[in-house]
């Protein structure tokens, strides 16, 4: 099993490029199921989750390949007849596999999709997906770990539906289903993340009638058919945010190229609050970590609030602050599993339910640590960069689900980091 080995305490200097957003690429690739023909999705990161979705679509009868000479382009050939099943063997490692449910129901009128897997960061049920699809006319049964869904009328029908809670994949799944439904659909209390808007843009490029994607109310007028997709996904705001936090660590000076400043407003506000210097530069943002951070209080929230996917990374910065910070996690339960590993590095963190109190220390010291989920693994890499001595991050398969060769991106900044194949 691979591990990442870091010799920490070395200042980072220079520029780093952001890959395409995994969480935008996955729904856009799934949307290809809505239309027969040859599709092209650009700026796609080469990540484990993307490869898993490609295998899943291949199982359904699609041809999926990376572009020759351009590994960031994924080309798909979707046949007229698509197998409507997503088996457990492929779905178990990636929660986003459930995104095929909406397109399959909309185009084929039936689907059999295994209940999803993914990171172990608490309950992330798909009940909102199923309630909304039922409102569109689907009949759904859960049997033997599978969602079995059919459309008795032959075609989904438009509806007005209000999500009980904001859900990114739920919003995306229902958007795709409604794109081929008969009549008008209005979705309320929708997730407002940039990735939702990106999917809306991709659907419009396919000929769908979608308005409001990226706001809390989305309007969709169903059409009989869609054309093949050609779309470039947005940059990964979480990867960008991870590098921005790296730049804010004491003594560092990092320019993150390709990030969208508008997607980073909540994070940038906190980075400036801790004392980091953040400036817009051509094509990105520059962050300078000027001295020991100041403590801040952080509360995660759905977009445009502070992203839960950046909570662990920011905690690393606050572990070095001159004072005590408070982090409140409101989005997912059980998302402080990285805390025990940070404590192994010398951090002082106490967790009470959804609240973590972080008492800053002058420095961290390297040690072997074990990743528990995707963003926790990124946080441990950041901590290793800041710590004195050697840090080994184990179970980096979590990291590979969301970061594209992170060690190869950090090394040119001066980081002493390498992957040891196991």
From Swiss-Prot:
**Which compartment or compartments is the protein found in?**
Cytoplasm
UniProtKB keywords: Cell cycle, Cell division, Cell shape, Cell wall biogenesis/degradation, Cytoplasm, Peptidoglycan synthesis, Pyruvate, Transferase
Source domain of life is Bacteria
Q: Residues bearing 2-(S-cysteinyl)pyruvic acid O-phosphothioketal?
A: 119
Chief subcellular location: cytoplasm
Active-site residues are 119
Q: What GO CC terms are in its UniProt record?
A: cytoplasm
Q: Which molecular function term from Gene Ontology is one that the record holds?
A: UDP-N-acetylglucosamine 1-carboxyvinyltransferase activity
This entry's Enzyme Commission designation comes to 2.5.1.7
Q: Name one Pfam family in it.
A: EPSP_synthase
Identify the enzyme class.
transferase
Q: Does the keyword Cell cycle apply?
A: yes
Q: Where does UDP-N-acetyl-alpha-D-glucosamine bind?
A: 95, 124-128, 309, 331
Name the positions where phosphoenolpyruvate binds. 22-23
What is a biological process (GO) this protein takes part in? cell wall organization
Cite the annotated pathway: Cell wall biogenesis; peptidoglycan biosynthesis
Q: What does this protein do?
A: Cell wall formation. Adds enolpyruvyl to UDP-N-acetylglucosamine.
Q: What is the recorded name of this protein? A: UDP-N-acetylglucosamine 1-carboxyvinyltransferase
| Organism (species) | Anaeromyxobacter sp. (strain K)
């Amino acid at each position: 099993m691979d591990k990442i080995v870091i010799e920490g305490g070395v200042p980072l200097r220079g520029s780093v490029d952001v890959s395409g957003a995994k969480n935008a690429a996955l729904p856009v690739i799934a949307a290809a199921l809505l239309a027969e023909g040859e599709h092209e999705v650009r700026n796609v990161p080469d990540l484990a989750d993307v490869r898993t979705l490609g295998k899943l679509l291949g199982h359904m009868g699609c041809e999926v390949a990376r572009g020759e000479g351009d590994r960031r382009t994924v080309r798909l050939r979707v046949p007229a007849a698509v197998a409507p099943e997503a088996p457990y063997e492929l779905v178990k490692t990636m929660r986003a596999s459930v995104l095929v449910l909406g397109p399959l129901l909309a185009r084929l009128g039936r689907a059999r999709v295994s209940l999803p897997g993914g990171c172990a960061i608490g309950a992330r049920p798909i009940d909102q997906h199923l309630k909304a699809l039922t409102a569109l006319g689907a009949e759904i049964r859960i049997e033997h770990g599978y969602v079995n869904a059919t459309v008795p009328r032959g075609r989904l029908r438009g509806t007005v539906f209000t999500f009980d809670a904001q859900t990114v994949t739920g919003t995306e799944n229902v958007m795709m289903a409604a794109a081929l439904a008969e009549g008008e659909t209005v979705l309320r209390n929708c997730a407002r993340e940039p990735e939702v808007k990106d999917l809306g843009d991709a659907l419009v490029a396919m000929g769908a009638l979608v308005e409001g994607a990226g706001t809390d109310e989305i309007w969709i007028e169903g059409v009989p058919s869609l054309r093949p997709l050609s779309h470039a996904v947005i940059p990964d705001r979480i990867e960008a945010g991870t590098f921005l936090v790296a730049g804010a660590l004491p003594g560092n000076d990092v320019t993150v190229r390709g990030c969208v400043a508008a997607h980073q407003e909540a994070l940038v506000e906190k980075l400036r609050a801790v004392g980091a210097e953040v400036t817009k530069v051509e094509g990105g943002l520059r962050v300078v970590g000027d001295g020991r951070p100041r403590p801040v209080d952080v509360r995660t929230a759905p977009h445009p609030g502070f992203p839960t996917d950046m909570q662990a990374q920011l905690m690393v910065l606050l572990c070095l602050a001159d004072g005590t910070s408070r982090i409140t996690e409101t989005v997912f339960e059980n998302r402080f599993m990285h805390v025990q590993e940070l404590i192994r590095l010398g951090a002082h963190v106490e967790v009470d339910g959804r609240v973590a109190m972080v008492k800053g220390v002058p420095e961290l010291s390297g040690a072997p640590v074990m990743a528990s989920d995707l963003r926790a693994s990124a946080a441990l890499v950041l901590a290793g960069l800041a710590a004195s001595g050697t840090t080994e991050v184990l179970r980096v398969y979590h990291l590979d689900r969301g970061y594209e060769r992170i060690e190869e991106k950090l090394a040119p900044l001066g980081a002493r980091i390498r992957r040891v194949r196991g």
